[in-house]
């Protein structure tokens, strides 16, 4: 009885991965904006998350976000090879948010993908679920009300809370802080 219930949950979570990926992308976009506006944030301290490896860097300089949006999804073979080499938690560390220019979510990929694009023109493909997890870890101690709200919503999405509407664009840029750090 327990086994079949667990198996049913696994199937239903697989079937709703696309919807959950869209919801997570919405809240991750808000977290990226909040992360970039928080002046004194420290990198998350957890040994279970691996730092991104140079081999996952997309092998050319990127001219614009449109180029990343139109890039093909990883094949199932490429995805399985990455998981075999780096594990399912293969994701960037906190230091990889320093010069972040844009984050692009590709929910149409299976599994969904996220691409981090930096001011230097380089881009790194990452697992969007673990990217969101790192953002939550980085922001959990922040006392700002809006940060606490977005973190709680993202945690609710992971726990099977209500889904939210997908944004009109999948190119999400961190908000710019006003002059003087306001």
UniProtKB/Swiss-Prot annotation:
Keywords: Disulfide bond, Fusion of virus membrane with host cell membrane, Fusion of virus membrane with host membrane, Glycoprotein, Host cell membrane, Host Golgi apparatus, Host membrane, Membrane, Signal, Viral envelope protein, Viral penetration into host cytoplasm, Virion, Virus entry into host cell. O-glycosylated, and sialylated. PROSITE patterns: GL_AHV. GO terms for biological process: fusion of virus membrane with host plasma membrane; symbiont entry into host cell. Pfam families: Herpes_UL1. It is a peripheral membrane protein. Coiled coil: none annotated. Interacts with glycoprotein H (gH); this interaction is necessary for the correct processing and cell surface expression of gH. The heterodimer gH/gL seems to interact with gB trimers during fusion. Belongs to the herpesviridae glycoprotein L (gL) family. Alphaherpesvirinae gL subfamily. The heterodimer glycoprotein H-glycoprotein L is required for the fusion of viral and plasma membranes leading to virus entry into the host cell. Acts as a functional inhibitor of gH and maintains gH in an inhibited form. Upon binding to host integrins, gL dissociates from gH leading to activation of the viral fusion glycoproteins gB and gH. This is Envelope glycoprotein L. The lineage of its organism: Viruses, Duplodnaviria, Heunggongvirae, Peploviricota, Herviviricetes.
